[in-house]
Amino acid sequence: PYSYPGVVPFGGEKVEWNAQKVSQYLAQPVDWAKARGVPLNRLVAGEFGCMRRLAGCKSYLDHVLTALDANNLHWAFYSFREDSWDGMDYELGSEKVNWKYWEAIEANKPDTLKRQPTAEFEPIRKRLQP
């Protein structure tokens, strides 16, 4: 697996992804909209996220959201309390879930894991506050 920040194959070459690169990359649709007279409040960044157990997930989320917030863009992260995979359920932190979680999923029942504020969820949580 990859870690963030770090080098990742992208567009046929190896690219260093960090806060600056994320900001630069996410500026492209903003520049496109401005060049065409599309109001920025019409742009939505949807379904971004990272596997919560990978190194740098919290930083990645924070860097993406910081770049989006710089232009007051709408956003929707993936995935809030996903019911079939724990990988992007940031309220679970960075540890593995116990077997009871998977037993519930396999039985098509709600899992009983308690969600709570975690370091991984903080970049999102703080932006959801009034």
Question: In which residue ranges do the predicted regions lie?
Answer:
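Extracellular glycoside hydrolase catalytic/binding regions
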Residues: 1-71
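Aromatic-rich peripheral "rim/lid" segments of glycoside hydrolase catalytic domains that contact
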Residues: 55-130
